[in-house]
């Protein structure tokens, strides 16, 4: 399980939250995620997918750029998805580990 935190909308089309929210979601395999989005966007190694196949919990509008963490480790950043918490459509996150050399060369960190 990984954690997503943010002040984004609590439901699709809703208002942003006045307090920081957190949701725990499972990582989704690259093949399962690629299958879900096969008619929309290509899932690359620069992406991590997470969410429940049944939907109900996800990042939403206003959460973009927020952290995807587990045990104090940053694994990803909220990137995109099809709506918010829709069944069969996991959230898509930037894969920080895959972009580590780019981050280092552009930030010095």
Predicted feature residues:
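Extracellular trypsin-like serine protease catalytic domains
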Residues: 3-109
């Amino acid at each position: 399980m990984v954690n997503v935190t943010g002040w984004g909308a609590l439901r699709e089309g809703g208002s942003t939250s006045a307090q920081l929210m957190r949701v725990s979601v499972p990582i989704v395999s690259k093949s399962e995620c690629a299958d879900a989005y096969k008619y929309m966007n290509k899932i690359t190694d620069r992406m991590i997918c997470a969410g429940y196949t049944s939907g109900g919990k996800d990042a939403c509008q206003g959460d973009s750029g927020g952290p995807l963490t587990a045990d104090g480790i940053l694994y990803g950043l909220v990137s995109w998805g099809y709506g918010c918490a829709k069944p069969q459509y996991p959230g898509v996150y930037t894969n920080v580990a895959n972009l580590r050399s780019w981050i280092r060369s552009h930030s010095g960190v």
